[in-house]
């Protein structure tokens, strides 16, 4: 890169532009730049102006110098020799400095830091304070990683008052910081190996999808311009760069080189390269321009169009042997083209009986090639028409001698001449013209007239066959051509036409026989027919390599057939070789005299690549004679694409403006398909459907092409009904006229049908109906065992069935069919990970990265592997890379951060349970929504992952009220748990700390004689005066919780401040035995919170002693099965319960149950129904409040069967949960003594009964209800409310809770 120059320089760079002006403004020059700058300016002024300014000021005189004579007016004053010598020396120094600065810019642009350092140091040795040299030094320091040194250099420039442009550029580079050297080396290695597309994505990731730093800009644009996706961006940005910096020669060179990459701009690029090669710039720039000039010429086709370019090159490089050979070949090719053009024009003129003009064209052809049999024969026909039989005979004989292969044709003409036959029949010529122009009724009328003439029977048959073929009546055309061949077995033209039709209808046997006959009669026609047969075989090839090989053979046989080239280009695109495909089509359309068919094929290819600019340029080159109805249709599509592109430019028009384009008939379906695709790109599927509906209503009757095109578009819209409808309509029309269906249409219909089956199967699979999905795919795989997509779809079915190994087998089958298929590689990597073959998964991911480096799918697969390994932070980074890559592919540029604020993307874990000492938290949960497109799904995942790895806080206000006798079983709890959670690499590995202020309220048991008798030791000791009060307590509970995937542990204490405090905690192991089956084993010590006595402990009003504070020491095990749509569990456990001055007790429990989703709405609402069976039993009944009892529900037996019904859902900011449970319960509690831990107290109580609690029990209905509603206030804060009611055993309970969750997500 050469150095930029601002419009108004303040330093010495300016005098290089206008030295004479600087001499006159010497005061402006003198100053901080020093004497060298002044002297250099003076000398440069002398050189440019040719004279010396007369110094009038005394301070300009040199002290001690001899006086000089005053020059006459108008004459420059002579200078002393010493002054002249000094000035010359200083001018030389200025020139050296100029050269060194230019070289410094160049070597920095080339990233040759060693040479750049040497050059810049030499410049600074000449002028240490030179602003540009210091600017270059700062850039070099940044390139070497010396940010601190570069900052000091920047400060020095600011102190010197350097130009603002230099300061701003260096400041921007310092702020951008050094780039990752490893990633930069990888990007450069990719570019050096010619893999420009992967290199482009690597550079974009390196620059975070932003602008490149100045020292890497040209390097990046070179790579960007060599890619299909980045060419236009590189061209636009480089053009703007050069416009801002017109003297940046390196950028000019880069732009000109990139312009030569496309045929439409190659001439402009060549002009620029030639100018640079001949200009007075540095030798390296000239050398690079010459090399780029030569490379561009190598891309030019070897045709007559390139002859002037070759001549110009060889005039300066006469020893270039390769271009000498190319020039000779181009001249030969052009001679052949000119001869062919003259010959064709001659025959056209002959058909209109313009004999003189026809003779001139034939003579031109013969001048080029004296042995051209067709031109010689044409001259014979002209002579015959002029009634010159001797001359006609001479030309026919010469034609027979010049072309033995076509001798039979001219022999027949000679025979007709000798027997007195006439020339070209005007009626035949008129019929041919009418058929070619599409005037079929006129052609039929003239055919009827011709058929009445004697001796024209064979001609009429041939013309009828041509008419039938042109109208698409293939069966009748085959019948007619067979009759022509039967009557004239050596008619090469009829044989060729019949063979071409056989290829079209798939009659390979007859086509092969005709090929054999043509090889003897007309080898050139035989080669064309063989090329058609190979092209048809390519249509049926099962793999890209085989298809490409067949098409290359076809192209070698018939290199001038544009349609074979178009097929080959499409095959190369399918195989991923886009550069070769583009080069092939450029070579086809580059010649100035490219045929109309070649231009048409180029337009079709360009439109398929969404290259509207190239399509429009080729359309402008189309001659009027080539503007067939097909070309007019293509032209309308080009205009449509241009209008859509204009509507998508800022300011972007609304969807209605795009939909309004569907305002005219659409017989081929391409118009509606393009409009629908544009609306789909805007995420407007309903508008896309409306566009297709308009196309159908405006085009009646339907055509096969349109119905097939619409079927494919409806498939993209995931509309199975409309896809099936369009396919059925296409099949009905194809059945009525089977010959009308081309091989391409048949293949497209097959692919749409396969896609429809896969979409149907995926729909079943999504909701767990894998049996139906497999039934849909099985016949597809039998009929199309080479369908990669079908194998991948079956793999997804197996994956849903948790048969990861079988899924991987299907993926590997697909990979055997197409080893480089990125979708198969992605599926194999995911399924290998699902089978826990992580090494294999990473191997497939590596292969995918090789095929699609930095593509969205590569990053998504990496994120899946990170997920399997439990690394959500790595997964988040990978998904963000995937999202940015997708934005780049979609042309959106840098992705915005708005997705973080989409309320629908945040779904809290709505059914989290309230846990003592911890509360109920509202962490993020992830939900897959089938309606999401790829970008939305990634945004949703990014939001979830950001939240799940961010520190977060939860706070609750919890109130619970339990029924019972005041002062005994009655309890009101008020708790405010506050929990801080710190995730590590994922939410499954986290640490939480909770603080829970808690207040418990119960009544005064002593206010009632019955309740007083059942409390503490009052029954035998009475109550002391201080005992008469409402019993309440308060404290603060603490808890530390650790989770690491399938392991969890917690430790804490019951609220500090309660009468009795206990250390509590637990462990849980929950490994997955299979994908569906899990084992859960837990144990620990927990509080029993049935009453204030069991929860906090109380003081006996009779003795003043404490009792209560019960804890449960438990162990529990369960097996849990979870599958899509349903789950089940079964387990049991044992516990020991004890407390302060409380009788010990044991519990056994068991339970089983499950639930299933019975209804869901668009994956946003669910209704689940289940069944829960439970049993528990205690050794003792301790649900009393006298001394030694525990105050907790403890029946001898409890059986319950409950049917839960649960409705949950999410809508924008709202998430809810409502669960109701009802069923049958039976329980029985044993009798118990008043004082189970003291025989003495019990003995005293026996003296004043009652001293025993009787047994009790009940059966009947039980149930509970709980509901929760959560609202997302913003991307960090959500709040919620919960209410619940339970009735079980002999008690009921009501609860309510307010909830808040705050995430420190850094957004």
Curated annotation (Swiss-Prot):
Listed pathway(s):
Glycan metabolism; bacterial cellulose biosynthesis
Against SMART domains, the record matches this protein to: TPR
Q: What is this protein called?
A: Cellulose synthase 2 operon protein C
Keyword entries, A-Z: Cell outer membrane, Cellulose biosynthesis, Membrane, Repeat, Signal, TPR repeat
Q: What does this protein do?
A: Required for maximal bacterial cellulose synthesis.
* Range of residues in the leader sequence: 1-55
Primary location: membrane
Q: Which Pfam families match?
A: BCSC_C (PF05420), TPR_16 (PF13432), TPR_19 (PF14559)
Q: Which family is this sequence assigned to? A: Belongs to the AcsC/BcsC family.
Q: Which GO terms describe its biological process?
A: cellulose biosynthetic process; UDP-alpha-D-glucose metabolic process
Superkingdom assignment: Bacteria
Q: Where in the cell is it found?
A: Cell outer membrane
Outline the TPR repeats, range by range: 97-130, 270-303, 339-372, 374-406, 458-491, 493-525, 528-561, 754-787, 788-821
Q: How does it sit in the membrane?
A: Peripheral membrane protein
GO cellular component annotations, sorted alphabetically? cell outer membrane
């Amino acid at each position: 890169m050469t150095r930029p120059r601002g419009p108004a320089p303040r330093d010495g760079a300016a005098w290089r532009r206008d030295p004479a002006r600087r001499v006159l403004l010497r005061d402006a020059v003198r100053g901080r730049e020093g004497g060298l700058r002044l002297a250099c300016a003076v000398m440069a002024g002398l050189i440019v102006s040719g004279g010396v300014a007369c110094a009038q000021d005394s301070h300009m005189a040199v002290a001690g110098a001899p006086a000089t004579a005053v020059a006459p007016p108008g004459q420059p004053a002579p200078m002393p020799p010493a002054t002249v010598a000094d000035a010359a020396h200083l001018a030389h120094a200025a020139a050296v400095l100029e050269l060194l600065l230019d070289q410094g810019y160049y070597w920095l642009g080339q990233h040759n830091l060693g040479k750049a350092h040497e050059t810049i140091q030499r410049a600074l040795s000449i002028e240490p304070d030179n602003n540009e040299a210091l600017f270059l030094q700062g850039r070099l320091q940044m390139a070497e990683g010396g940010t601190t040194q570069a900052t000091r250099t920047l400060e020095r420039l600011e102190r010197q008052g350097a130009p603002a442009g230099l300061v701003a550029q260096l400041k921007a580079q310092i702020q951008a910081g050094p780039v990752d050297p490893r990633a930069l080396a990888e990007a450069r290695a990719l570019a050096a190996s010619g893999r420009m597309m992967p290199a482009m994505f690597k550079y974009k990731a390196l620059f975070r999808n932003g602008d490149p730093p100045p020292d890497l800009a040209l390097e990046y644009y070179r790579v960007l311009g060599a890619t299909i996706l980045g060419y236009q961006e590189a061209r636009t940005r480089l053009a703007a760069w050069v416009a801002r910096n017109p003297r940046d020669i390196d950028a000019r060179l880069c732009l000109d080189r990139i312009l030569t990459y496309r045929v439409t701009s190659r001439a402009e690029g060549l002009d620029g390269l030639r100018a640079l090669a001949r200009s007075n710039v540095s030798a390296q720039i000239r050398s690079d321009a010459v090399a780029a000039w030569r490379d561009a010429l190598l891309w030019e086709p070897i045709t007559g169009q390139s002859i002037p370019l070759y001549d110009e090159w060889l005039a300066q490089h006469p020893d270039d042997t390769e271009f000498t050979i190319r020039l000779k070949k181009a001249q030969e090719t052009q001679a052949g083209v000119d001869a062919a053009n003259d010959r064709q024009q001659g025959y056209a003129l002959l058909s209109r009986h313009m004999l003189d003009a026809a003779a001139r064209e034939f003579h031109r052809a013969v001048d080029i090639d004296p042995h051209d049999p067709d031109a010689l024969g044409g001259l014979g026909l002209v002579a015959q028409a002029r009634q010159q039989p001797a001359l006609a005979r001479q030309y026919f004989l010469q034609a027979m001698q010049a072309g033995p292969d076509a001798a039979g044709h001219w022999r027949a003409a000679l025979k007709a001449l000798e027997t007195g036959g006439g020339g070209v029949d005007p009626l035949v010529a008129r019929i041919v013209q009418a058929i070619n122009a599409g005037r079929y009724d006129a052609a039929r009328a003239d055919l009827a007239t011709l058929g009445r003439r004697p001796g024209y029977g064979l001609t009429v048959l041939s013309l009828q066959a041509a008419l039938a073929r042109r109208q698409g009546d293939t069966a009748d055309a085959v019948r007619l051509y067979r009759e022509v061949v039967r009557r004239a077995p050596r008619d090469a033209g009829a044989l060729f036409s019949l063979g071409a039709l056989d290829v079209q209808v798939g009659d390979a046997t007859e086509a092969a026989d005709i090929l054999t006959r043509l090889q003897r009669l007309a080898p050139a026609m035989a080669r064309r027919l063989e090329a058609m047969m190979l092209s048809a075989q390519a249509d049926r090839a099962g793999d890209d390599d085989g298809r490409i090989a067949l098409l290359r053979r076809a192209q070698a046989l018939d290199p001038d057939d544009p349609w074979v080239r178009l097929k080959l280009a499409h095959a190369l695109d399918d195989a991923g070789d886009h550069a070769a495909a583009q080069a092939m089509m450029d070579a086809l359309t580059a010649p100035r005299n490219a045929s109309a068919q070649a231009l048409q094929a180029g337009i079709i290819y360009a439109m398929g690549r969404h290259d509207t600019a190239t399509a429009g340029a080729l359309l402008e080159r189309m001659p009027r004679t080539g503007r067939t109805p097909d070309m007019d249709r293509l032209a309308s599509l080009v205009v449509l694409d241009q209008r859509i592109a204009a509507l998508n430019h800022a300011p972007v028009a609304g969807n209605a403006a795009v939909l309004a384009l569907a305002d005219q008939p659409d017989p081929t379906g391409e118009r509606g398909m393009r409009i629908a695709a544009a609306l789909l790109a805007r995420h407007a599927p309903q508008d896309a459907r409306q566009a297709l509906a308009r196309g159908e209503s405006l085009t009646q009757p339907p055509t096969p092409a349109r119905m097939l095109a619409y079927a494919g578009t409806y498939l993209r819209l995931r509309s199975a009904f409309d896809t099936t409808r369009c396919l059925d309509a296409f099949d009905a029309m194809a059945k009525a006229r089977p010959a009308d269906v081309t091989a391409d249409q048949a293949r497209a219909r097959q692919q749409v049908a396969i896609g429809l089956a896969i979409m149907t199967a995926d729909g079943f699979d999504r909701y767990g109906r894998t049996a139906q999905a497999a039934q849909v795919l099985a016949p597809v795989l039998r009929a199309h065992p080479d369908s990669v997509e079908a194998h991948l779809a079956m793999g997804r079915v197996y994956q849903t069935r948790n048969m990861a190994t079988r899924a991987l087998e299907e993926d590997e089958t697909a990979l055997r069919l197409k080893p480089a298929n990125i979708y198969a590689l992605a599926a194999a990597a995911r399924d290998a990970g699902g089978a826990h073959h992580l090494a294999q998964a990473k191997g497939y991911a590596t292969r995918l990265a090789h095929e699609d480096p930095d593509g969205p799918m590569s990053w998504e697969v990496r994120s899946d592997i990170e997920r399997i390994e439990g690394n959500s932070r790595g997964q988040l980074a990978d998904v963000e890379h995937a999202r940015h890559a997708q934005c780049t592919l979609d042309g959106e540029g840098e992705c915005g951060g708005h997705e973080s604020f989409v309320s629908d993307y945040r779904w809290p874990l709505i059914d989290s349970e309230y846990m003592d000492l911890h509360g109920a938290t509202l962490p993020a949960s992830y939900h897959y929504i089938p309606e999401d497109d790829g970008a939305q799904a990634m945004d949703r995942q990014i939001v979830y992952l950001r939240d799940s790895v961010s520190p977060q806080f939860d706070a609750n206000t919890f109130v619970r009220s339990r029924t019972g006798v005041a002062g005994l079983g009655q309890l009101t709890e008020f708790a405010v748990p506050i929990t801080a959670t710190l995730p590590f690499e994922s939410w499954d590995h986290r640490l939480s700390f909770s603080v829970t202020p808690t207040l418990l309220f119960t009544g005064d048991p002593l206010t009632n004689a019955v309740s007083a008798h059942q409390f503490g030791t009052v029954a035998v000791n009475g109550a002391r005066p201080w005992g008469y009060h409402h019993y309440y307590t308060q404290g603060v509970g603490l808890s530390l919780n650790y989770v690491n995937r399938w392991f969890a542990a917690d430790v804490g204490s019951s609220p500090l401040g309660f009468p009795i405090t206990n250390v509590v905690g637990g462990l849980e192991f929950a490994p997955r035995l299979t994908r569906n089956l899990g084992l859960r084993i837990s144990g620990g010590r927990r509080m029993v919170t049935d009453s204030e006595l069991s929860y906090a402990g109380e003081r006996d009003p009779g003795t003043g002693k404490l009792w209560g504070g019960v804890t449960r020491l438990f162990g529990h095990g369960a097996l849990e099965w979870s599958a899509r749509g349903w789950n089940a569990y079964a387990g049991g456990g044992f516990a020991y319960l004890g407390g302060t001055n409380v009788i010990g007790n044991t519990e056994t429990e068991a339970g089983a149950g499950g639930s299933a989703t019975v209804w869901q709405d668009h994956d946003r609402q669910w209704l689940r129904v289940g069944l829960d069976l439970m049993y528990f039993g205690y050794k003792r009944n301790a649900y009393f409040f006298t001394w030694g009892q525990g105050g907790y529900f403890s029946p001898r037996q409890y059986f319950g069967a409950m049917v839960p019904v649960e409705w949950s859902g999410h809508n924008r900011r709202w998430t809810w949960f409502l669960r109701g449970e009802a069923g049958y319960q039976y329980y029985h509690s044993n009798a118990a003594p008043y004082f189970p831990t003291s025989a003495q107290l019990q003995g005293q109580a026996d003296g004043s009964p009652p001293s025993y609690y009787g047994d009790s029990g009940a059966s009947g209905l039980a149930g509970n209800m709980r509901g929760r509603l959560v609202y997302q206030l913003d991307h960090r804060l959500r709040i919620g409310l919960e209410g619940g009611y339970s009735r079980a055993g002999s008690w009921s309970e009501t609860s309510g809770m307010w909830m808040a969750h705050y995430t420190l997500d850094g957004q």
